[in-house]
A protein has these predicted regions:
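Eukaryotic intrinsically disordered, low-complexity segments enriched for acidic and Ser/Thr/Pro residues
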Residues: 21-158, 188, 238, 266-273, ...
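Long, amphipathic alpha-helical regulatory blocks in the mid-to-C-terminal portion
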Residues: 216-218, 222-223, 276-296, 347, ...
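Alpha-helical solenoid scaffolds
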Residues: 119, 161-164, 203, 207, ...
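Acidic, Ser/Thr-rich intrinsically disordered and amphipathic helical segments
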Residues: 82, 116, 123, 172, ...
Length: 452
């Protein structure tokens, strides 16, 4: 196999026994096996989880001066270096602990840490995009390396700036989901009794979910297509199209979950509104599951991600069948009452299954636990068993879970209303315009000198 060319060849030679790489015409891809040790730090316990974040990919240092020093001005090289180094340091320090959702951390430090790192990424992105503007050939000069979380390979490096853009958007989305998780952990009320979640926090979380979905949607529609097919095939599973789509749908599904909880608390929301939200939630989670079903999510973070989606999909079906059953029960025919009973029984069974799925998720490494119930599931965990038992007159012990689900009426199909934020890649930083002007002046002077 051919070796990647460039100034880092001596390093690659030293590392050849533990690094596999694939030569590309436009750059090189480097993947370090999971057992090579060292960089990937995983917590044994991530505490309370309402929004699952499958770890944070951490960037490794890059020396821009080595690869770009002969091609760009000192100003641009130093800006790229300073902005990315800031991210490397912050992500390296906070990444392994940022998913630790201790309530103290969430209220005193977590928010500012997330916001600072998010701002650092937003500052870096416009400058980074100068490397890919108008097919800039410099996009293949720098090898960008990131530590993976869901992939079996510990790290992946590619000599393509679009890979760096993709990694930045993914990290921005994961930080947003982390922020939503911290926001949705109920705080102990002033009277010291039942933990509560404010209306303001719930509304803010929906905005964050939509924003996270926007980053991921942009990554899938506008960044992935920029990578050559060979690069896309060799992306870590963290950045696979299926995982990106699943995370986008997960964010929207959890946003609708919050909307449903708010509808439950509202005296103005009708049963029809609640059923529609619950049925939409089922579709989001079903599509999320379809996207990751056949992906190699086998290690800790990846397997836990799969279990989270499975749990939330089952939980959503419990909610949808419950509200569908209540509406069917409003009918005046014997058939509608029979269908209502079947729907409520299915809701009860799905609720039981969701509790098993929840236990499987929390017991998978890294370990986690549920925050105090609130919103949708707090209400439904009390109402479903009660309403199902009052409506169901048959001996449910005679029926298996599979039989009950088979006889349940079909859920209505609604168009999905909650959409990702229309995030667009920012314009290239103005410093690149100055760079082009300066380069043009240098080229003009050189041409006149040659003509003499």
């Amino acid at each position: 196999m051919n070796r990647c060319k460039g100034r880092n060849s001596s390093f690659l030679k030293k590392e050849r026994q533990k690094i596999n790489f694939i030569s590309q015409d436009m750059g090189c891809l480097v993947s370090k096996p999971a057992d090579s040790g060292g960089n990937r730090r995983r917590p044994g316990n991530i505490g309370e989880v309402y929004v699952y974040v499958p770890g944070l990919r951490i960037p490794k240092p890059v020396d821009f001066s080595l690869t770009l020093g002969d091609h760009l001005s000192k100003n641009i090289v130093e800006r790229l270096s300073a902005l990315r180094t800031r991210i490397v340091v912050m992500a390296g320090q906070e990444g392994p602990t940022i998913t630790r959702t201790r309530r103290k951390t969430a209220t005193q430090h977590g928010g500012s840490t997330l916001a600072d790192l998010q701002q650092a990424l937003e500052d870096y992105l416009p400058v980074l995009l100068g490397l890919v503007k108008d097919g800039n050939q410099l996009q293949h000069k720098v090898q960008f390396a990131w530590i993976n979380q869901e992939d079996d390979l510990e790290e992946t490096a590619m000599s393509n700036a679009w890979y760096e853009v993709l990694s930045v958007l993914h990290l921005m989305a994961m930080l947003s989901l982390s922020q939503a998780n911290l926001l949705l952990l109920p705080r102990t009320s002033a009277d010291g009794y039942q933990p509560k979640l404010s209306e303001e926090s719930r509304r803010a979380s929906i905005d964050i979910f939509v924003k996270a979905a926007g980053y991921l949607d942009c990554a899938v529609r506008h960044v992935l297509p920029q990578l050559p097919a060979e690069f896309r095939r060799n992306l870590p599973v963290d950045l696979a199209e299926g995982v990106l789509r699943a995370l986008c749908l997960q964010a929207l599904g959890q946003g609708v979950d919050i909307q449903l909880g708010m509808a439950i608390d509202s005296t103005k929301a009708t049963l029809a509104v609640k059923r529609r939200l619950a049925c939409e939630m089922v579709k989001y989670w079903q599509q999320a599951q379809d996207n990751i079903m056949n992906l190699p999510l086998s290690n800790g973070w990846g397997e836990k991600h799969r279990l989270f989606v499975k749990w939330k999909y089952i939980e959503a079906k419990a909610a949808a069948y419950y509200y569908h059953g209540l509406i069917l029960d409003e009918g005046n025919t014997e058939k509608s009452h029979g269908m209502a009973v079947a729907a409520l029984q299915a809701a009860d069974e799905y609720l039981k299954e969701s509790k098993k799925a929840c236990e499987a998720f929390n017991s998978a490494t890294p370990l986690s636990r549920n925050p105090p119930l609130f919103g949708t599931m707090k209400y439904l965990s009390e109402k479903i068993p009660k309403d199902a038992s009052s409506k169901v007159r048959i001996n449910r012990d005679l029926y298996s879970f599979e039989k009950i689900v088979e006889t349940a009426p079909t859920l209505p199909d609604f168009a999905l209303a909650l959409k990702p934020d229309e995030f667009q890649l920012p314009g290239v930083d103005p410093s690149w315009n100055e760079e082009n002007i300066n380069r043009g002046q240098v080229g003009s002077k050189q041409l006149k000198s040659d003509q003499r």
